[in-house]
Amino acid sequence: MPNFYVIHNPHAGNGEHTAVTNNIRNMPNVIEWFDTEYPDHAIYLAKNLAKTLVDAEAVVLVIGGDGTLNETLNGLLQIQRHQYLPIAYIPIGTGNDFARACHIGSSDEVINRLQQIVKPKMINVGKIIGEAPHQTTQYFVNNMGMGFDAAVVAQTNHSKWKTYFNKLHFGAMSYAFTAFSTFFNQNSFPVTITNGEEYYHLHQVFLATIVNQPYFGGLAILPQADLFEEQLDMIVVEKMSFIHFLTLFIGLKKDGRHLKDQKVHHFTLQKGAQIHVHDIQPGQLDGEELGNGSFIFTTTLQTYPFWI
């Protein structure tokens, strides 16, 4: 039986998940419980667990949204260990794209299943090795984006509409609402992609996103993407009219026909592909703000054990 070490974001999902946390606290194999208290606190907590835990049955149980999951993953991977600590995940946030991609189900279903799992599944996570704006290595489970999608993340996180939609349990609607208002303020920018022996330079880019699974903000940006396949993809969208954008946006919620549009480019990235965003743009990693910068980084994949 696993021993669970819990990292819980009490603010996820507007904090309306007391019944879920009470059920988990009553589980006999919950060993320690940590509440996050400030941004990036989950990184610190996970790093500490990776440094100190010698429990062979330890599983880090994340209760929160995609952001808390991302912080935990990055904290655990900052420490070299003989064996990685598996991550279990109960989605209670407003951004639950990872849970959607893994078909995890509701929090109640996850709680019931946690005790029945006998070994973790190895899942691919994206890895970026940055040269600019910071020399750093970071990991993501969903996507890493620059331009429009990152601007939407930043605007949504600081918008009063996010709280309103979350209270109505329409978290994805906050992204959709912000997307339309952000469209008119997003400038185009040049991007260079060095992908194996192939080289691409696009001049009027509107959005550049590296994806590890189908969803962004609940929308299927790349329906065929699969967390269990050893592959990262990149979607690049060029600047377009608002009507054109609206047509594409509707397609995102259906069958992926947006990928056939002449303004949309899909690249299957080889390991070691290099991306260069030449102008200063906002960035996001699993829905968490990276700040603004001109980005230069290399992409690759790594597997990590998940208790799902």
Predicted regions and their residues:
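Glycine-rich phosphate/pyrophosphate-binding beta-alpha loops
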Residues: 149, 207-222, 289
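Short, well-ordered alpha-helical microsegments
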Residues: 42, 69-70, 217, 292
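Glycine-rich beta-alpha junction loops
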Residues: 10, 144-148, 211-214, 239
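Catalytic core of DAGKc-family lipid kinases
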Residues: 79-88, 92-200, 204
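Short glycine-/acidic-enriched loop or helix-start segments at secondary-structure transitions
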Residues: 16-17, 71-73, 99-101, 151, ...
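ATP/nucleoside-binding phosphotransfer catalytic cores, i.e., glycine-rich phosphate-binding loops
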Residues: 195-197, 202, 221-222, 226-229, ...
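ATP/NTP phosphate-donor binding region
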Residues: 1-63, 70, 74, 79, ...
